[in-house]
């Protein structure tokens, strides 16, 4: 599913830039999400990370709204998809620059 938390236009690109660095560092520190290692990090127009089982999460700035775009998917389970969302949401909430989501899982 795709979720869009509010983030001011003048802040959203900096928030994403900071998250790119954090996710790369978490991968380098062998961080696990729901028991799965982060195996790959792509940083084109945001950050997309993959886990060992093929599950993934993505954070990028919306190109046409004052918001971010958050996507999570998991072939393993809906529960893992939710845990990935919780992981991303935790990182975003720590920025102090995120408002309400249009929806959550």
Predicted feature residues:
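Phosphate-binding and adjacent anionic-ligand microenvironments
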Residues: 1-71, 77-105
């Amino acid at each position: 599913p795709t979720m869009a938390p509010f983030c001011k236009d003048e802040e959203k690109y900096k928030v994403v830039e900071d998250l790119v660095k954090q996710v790369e560092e978490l991968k380098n520190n062998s961080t696990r999400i729901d028991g799965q290692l982060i195996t790959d990090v792509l940083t084109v127009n945001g950050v997309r990370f993959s886990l060992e089982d093929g599950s993934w999460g993505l954070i990028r700035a919306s190109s046409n709204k004052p918001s971010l775009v958050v996507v999570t998917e998991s072939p393993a389970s809906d529960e893992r998809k939710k845990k990935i969302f919780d992981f991303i949401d935790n990182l975003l909430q720590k920025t102090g620059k995120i408002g309400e989501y249009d929806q959550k899982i």
